[in-house]
Design a protein with these regions (language model features):
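DNA-dependent DNA polymerase catalytic subunits
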Residues: 1-33, 40, 48, 67-88, ...
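Short glycine-rich loop/turn motifs that provide flexible caps or phosphate-binding loops at active sites
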Residues: 42, 104-107, 419
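Core alpha/beta catalytic barrel or barrel-like domain that forms the active/cofactor pocket
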Residues: 104-110, 153-162
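Inter-lobe coupling/hinge region of RecA-like P-loop helicase motors
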Residues: 109-122
């Protein structure tokens, strides 16, 4: 085994099989961080995780079956019961998922009975090797098939890859496939490619890796998840997919799968999240002019909304720590929502309104909004628990322009940049002469 270690074991070398593992005894498995494990006895943790994984697969299957049942059920009176079933099975499978993932965290915690950083590192490096291995293999497969030299895996995560099949679809059906064939037929074709070609190839590729590493048991497998006709990545782990089929559940209308963007973040006002999702749907099927009209119309609607609906939700902590007893009510570097909370409390006391309204306390959920200056509070922000006291007279000072920019336009501009669209019509010299 010293012969193996002396070659410098790491993920990059194992990916290219540049480490000779022929000297490794048959009853020993190597992990990418250079650790060795015996194979004559199965450890309690792998055995326990295997049982949990089987349970999760069972509940996940029931969850997906219920989702498809909901898609096919036209009777609204029956849909409620199906939705309850979906929620139950989803909660059960997610609970199992959290339990499975927590095993890695436990191995890296000094308070765990079997804490060992070598074990935790073995898990992370094995994950890196597995996902990068299949990424390379799939790129090789697609390049050999299409006689190209490019990357077809456009992104990868800890346990998944994102593969573009547009070139394959064009080769089989022609470049005008979007015009002459329904999208559902293209999705059917992609589904067959994944099930009949890619999944068996992935299984074969992982067997090759398992044999090379002399694993205890080959458990690595990949199943097709989402089939989409369009997708956008704004950054790593921040993307949108226009999904027609998710893990075998075929949607009557495409569903947006959104990861890491403001539209799914609780720090974005709920009314704004709804409009963000509407705009993303329009981006997927509309034009730049449609988007510009949508933004213009929503801006008018936005300015008519009450401050409570357009303000940022936050949890507030550190009111006492950031408060100042001098002429400045807060110290330098105070977070903006905490600054607003300090101002809110100060003026409640100054205006003797503490019997009518409660002070903001540590740990409470609040909202904050930007103010136009000058204003009675001589500051640029106000926070509040539910609504702004009418006695403050601040409603007319809410900076709707800045709120619109911060809550809606700036986050959506990132998505518009991906497709090269402008939020507003830009006049050009060429357009002037037309």
């Amino acid at each position: 085994m010293r012969e193996v270690i002396s070659q410098g074991v790491n993920v990059d070398k194992l990916l290219t099989k540049s480490i000779d593992l022929s000297a490794l005894p048959n009853d020993v498995v190597l992990t990418p961080n250079g650790q060795f494990f015996k194979k004559d006895v199965r450890g309690f943790l792998p055995q326990m995780l295997d049982e949990m994984y089987v349970d999760r697969k069972k509940f996940k299957k029931l969850y997906l079956e219920a989702k498809q049942e909901l898609e096919n059920e036209p009777d609204e009176s029956k849909q409620y019961e199906i939705e309850k079933k979906i929620a139950r099975y989803n909660n059960l499978q997610l609970a199992k998922k959290v339990g499975l993932n927590s095993a890695y965290g436990a191995l890296g915690s000094q308070y765990f009975r079997f804490f060992d950083l070598r074990l935790a590192l073995a898990v992370t490096t094995a994950g890196q090797l597995s996902i990068r291995w299949i990424q390379n293999k799939i790129n090789d497969y697609m390049n050999n098939l299409l006689k190209t030299e490019t990357d077809y895996v456009i992104a990868s995560d800890t346990d998944s890859i994102y593969l573009r099949l547009g070139e394959l679809v064009d080769k089989v059906y022609g470049a005008d496939v979007k015009v002459c064939m329904p999208t559902t037929k293209v999705i059917d074709f992609m589904d067959r490619v994944c099930n009949d070609k890619l999944e068996p190839y992935i299984e074969k590729s992982y067997k090759e890796l398992g044999d090379y590493m002399q694993v205890f048991e080959q458990k690595m497998q990949m199943k097709r998840e989402s089939l989409a006709d369009k997708g956008m990545w704004t950054a790593k782990k921040r993307y949108i997919l226009n999904v027609y089929d998710n893990e075998g559940v075929r949607y009557n209308e495409p569903d947006l799968k959104i990861m890491g963007l403001e539209v799914i973040k609780s720090s974005t006002p709920s009314a704004i999240r709804v409009k963000m999702k509407e705009m993303i749907s329009l981006i997927m099927k509309g034009t730049e002019k449609d988007i510009q009209k949508f933004i213009k119309d929503f801006k008018k609607e936005f300015k008519a909304m009450p401050p409570e609906e357009i303000s940022f939700p936050r949890g507030v902590n550190g009111i006492r720590n950031y408060s100042n007893s001098g002429s400045m009510l807060y110290i330098k570097g105070t977070p903006i929502h905490v600054k607003g909370a300090i101002l809110y409390n100060h003026y409640l006391k100054e205006m003797k309104l503490t019997k009518k309204y409660e002070l903001i306390k540590e740990g409470e959920k609040i909202k904050f909004a930007y103010l136009k200056e000058p204003n009675p509070f001589k500051d640029s922000v106000i926070s509040f628990p539910n609504r702004i006291p009418t006695e403050y007279g601040l409603d007319k000072y809410i900076d709707y322009e800045l709120q619109f920019e911060k809550t809606f336009l700036a986050p959506m501009q990132t998505i518009l940049d991906c497709v090269g669209w402008k939020a507003e019509k830009v006049n050009t010299l060429e357009g002037f002469f037309k």
